[in-house]
Swiss-Prot record:
Summary of the function given for this chain in its UniProt record: This protein is involved in the repair of mismatches in DNA. It is required for dam-dependent methyl-directed DNA mismatch repair. May act as a 'molecular matchmaker', a protein that promotes the formation of a stable complex between two or more DNA-binding proteins in an ATP-dependent manner without itself being part of a final effector complex.
Keywords: DNA damage, DNA repair
Cellular-component GO terms for this entry: mismatch repair complex
Domain of life, per lineage: Bacteria
Region (Disordered): 332-416
Matches recorded under PROSITE patterns: DNA_MISMATCH_REPAIR_1 (PS00058)
SUPFAM superfamilies, per database record: ATPase domain of HSP90 chaperone/DNA topoisomerase II/histidine kinase, DNA mismatch repair protein MutL, Ribosomal protein S5 domain 2-like
Gene designation: mutL
Protein name per UniProt: DNA mismatch repair protein MutL
Taxonomic lineage: Bacteria, Pseudomonadati, Thermodesulfobacteriota, Desulfuromonadia, Desulfuromonadales
Family, per entry: Belongs to the DNA mismatch repair MutL/HexB family.
Length: 628
């Protein structure tokens, strides 16, 4: 009987390995630049032609290699970074498998030039399709130069999957942006077809590097983070205020021990950290570094090394969430970046340009080919304190997001109702401990929906419904976490009838409903008597409120813990209780609202992620009136 199983030839093994490691030109750039960083390079230049299809050249001034090491680096699983099994669990380098160079050389025309600093001359190796064609001494500067020509020349099926030059160039730019952000102390230069796209010099801080690559305007809306955690963990970097957000994940740069990762645990923690601060479908812009004991994280999970596995996932997740929430909560409202202001100094931009996927053009959804300065980060189309960002209407704020019918139904306008100034309008009494909102000079109420205030030279417009929504939500949340929400006894119990499905849900969740402030007793069949409801919601439509909360329980499902969707339920309750738009407020009511905002965490945004206030500087107003 003939033998069916046989050992594959080395060249075919390398091509198979290349399928895992080398997906596109950007994958080649990533592997080569990571090798340069591991070699201690302080200057790295990347030259590409035709989006990396024709040429990729990476030049570095790292430690270089001897003749023997130059030959060995082309062998599979040959590496200087791992010697024993235990080394896999304390990795401090970006590379470690010894697969990249032989895999790349197997599918390209590969040239390696390298020299040790102490040697008089270097060495050149020419490889084609994994076979060494020529080797000789060469005059090269200390460091390493690797050229990759005609990628996938011998695997045409793989080459057919490459996109347009602009698309591949965009992916290379994105890869280099990640690597450059991770190493501010390293100089990077990026060239395409002989033209320099961007260059970043050695910088002393992450702020300077982020300003070069993401844009000065973006960095002005970012906040520094520094937090020590359990088990020696440390989180540091920059996070955006809620004002700066994007529709995709392209603005989130997360690193573990200096390695860029896209980990589900970290992504979930970031989403939790910004929960109820961003509108649905929006994501923050951030550059975050998590330093952790290498023995507590496994990076040998995926060929791209973008996925990791933590030994204590819950510990890492909760540490990141708490660090983000604490930093976002501690930033005073008055310090939230307004146009031209920043929590720290941003250096002048030189000639760097971010090369990243353009997420704003549907026709180019898979074509990262936008090359212009400052496009590495973008402001949201959801407004925040700057008036220039307003693109949404009042109607979309009230009815759709709150889930309460009729929330935005406006009464007929009248001269009295359009803009009202209370007779006793006066500057708020300021003390040394006055918060931002309490220090505002209250001018009046516009269209019974917005409070008009003045802060020094700035004009402030406050959305009364969004502000009350945040206040009510935080009050309910605080009471719930304390054990139970305060209840109000009804003089006459309200009998509610449900269908069979919802009736079973009410019966099953009566304890949870009681903790939320609703005391319900079975009244026979699928009927229940409501005897108590949250004191804060005593003015709300009790029947509709209970039915809405029960519907939320039905949406959660029996298999999920109530706490998972707790904030959604509390938000629904807050929507019923709060002051609506088009509701006339007295001066004392408006002043009480301002005072309460200062006592409320995350008061710059409602729980849906919309801003509670907008700010115009005097300069902005003068420009609008053509006076500047």
């Amino acid at each position: 009987m003939s033998q069916k199983i046989h050992i594959l030839p080395e060249s075919l093994c390398n091509q198979i390995a290349a399928g895992e490691v080398v997906e596109r030109p950007a994958s080649v750039v990533k592997e080569l630049v990571e090798n340069a960083l591991d070699a201690g390079a302080s200057r790295i230049q990347v030259d590409v032609e035709n989006g990396g299809k024709r040429l990729i050249r990476v030049t570095d001034n790292g430690c270089g290699m001897s003749r023997e090491d130059a030959f060995l680096c082309l062998e599979r699983h040959a590496t200087s970074k791992v010697r024993a099994e235990q080394d896999l669990f304390r990795l401090t380098t970006l590379g470690f498998r010894g697969e990249a160079l032989p895999s790349i050389a197997a599918v390209s025309r590969f040239t390696l030039r390298t020299r040790l600093a102490e040697d008089v001359e270097g060495w050149e190796l020419v490889v084609e399709g994994g076979t060494v064609k020529r080797s000789s001494a060469a005059g090269v500067p200390p460091g390493t130069i690797i050229e990759i020509r005609n990628l996938f020349f011998n695997t045409p099926a793989r080459r057919k999957f490459l996109r347009r030059d602009e698309t591949e160039l965009g992916h290379i730019g994105e890869t280099l942006t990640r690597l450059a952000l991770s190493c501010p102390e390293v100089c990077f230069r990026f060239m395409h077809n002989g033209r320099m796209l961007w260059e970043v010099n050695r910088q002393k801080s992450l702020v300077e590097r982020a300003a070069e690559l993401l844009g000065r305007e973006a960095v002005r809306d970012m906040l520094p983070v520094e937090r020590q955690g359990p088990e020696g963990m440390r989180l540091h970097g920059l996070i955006s205020s809620p004002r700066l957000n994007r529709s995709g994940l392209g603005g989130m740069f997360t690193f573990i021990n200096g390695r860029f990762i896209r980990d589900k645990v970290v992504q979930h923690a970031l989403a939790d950290g910004y929960r109820n601060l961003l509108a649905k479908g929006r994501h923050p812009v951030l550059v975050l570094f998590l330093e952790i004991d290498p023995s507590q994280v496994d990076v040998n999970v995926h060929p791209t090394k973008h996925e990791v596995r933590f030994r204590q996932q819950a510990l890492v997740h909760d540490f990141i969430v708490k660090a983000l929430r604490d930093h976002l909560q501690q930033v005073p409202t008055s310090a939230m970046p307004a146009p031209g202001n920043s929590p720290f100094t941003v250096p002048a931009r030189e000639n760097a340009a971010s090369v990243k996927p353009d997420e704003t053009k549907p026709a180019l959804a898979d074509t990262p080919a936008a090359f212009s300065a400052g496009e590495g980060s973008s402001r949201s189309d959801v407004p925040y304190p700057s008036a220039s960002q307003v693109t949404e209407t009042t109607d979309s704020y009230d009815a759709h997001d709150s889930g309460v019918e009729g929330a935005s139904t406006a009464p007929p306008l009248s001269e009295e109702g359009l803009f009202s100034v209370t007779a006793d309008v006066r500057p708020s009494e300021q003390t040394e401990n006055s918060g931002f909102f309490a220090s505002l000079r209250l001018i009046g109420q516009y269209q019974n929906s917005y409070l008009v205030c003045q802060s020094e030279k700035d004009l402030i417009l406050i959305d009364q419904h969004a502000a009350h929504e945040r206040i009510g939500f935080e009050h309910l949340r605080k009471q719930y976490l304390a054990g139970s929400i305060e209840r109000q006894l009804l003089l006459f119990p309200l009998v509610l009838e449900f269908d069979f499905r919802l009736g079973r849900i009410v019966e099953e969740q009566r304890d949870s409903l009681f903790r939320l402030g609703f005391a319900l007793e079975n009244f026979g069949g699928n009927a229940f008597a409501l005897k108590e409801l949250p004191r804060m919601l005593k003015e709300a439509d009790a029947e509709r409120l209970v039915r809405d909360v029960v519907d939320e329980f039905a949406a959660i499902g029996r298999s999920q813990a109530v706490e998972i969707e707790l904030e959604r339920i509390l938000l629904k309750m807050a929507c019923h209780a709060m002051v609506r738009a088009h509701q006339r407020l007295s001066f004392d009511e408006m002043q009480a609202l301002l005072d309460e905002l200062d006592k409320t965490p995350f008061s710059s945004n409602c729980p849906h992620g919309r801003p509670t206030f907008l700010r115009w500087s005097l300069g902005e107003l003068e420009r609008l009136f053509k006076r500047a």
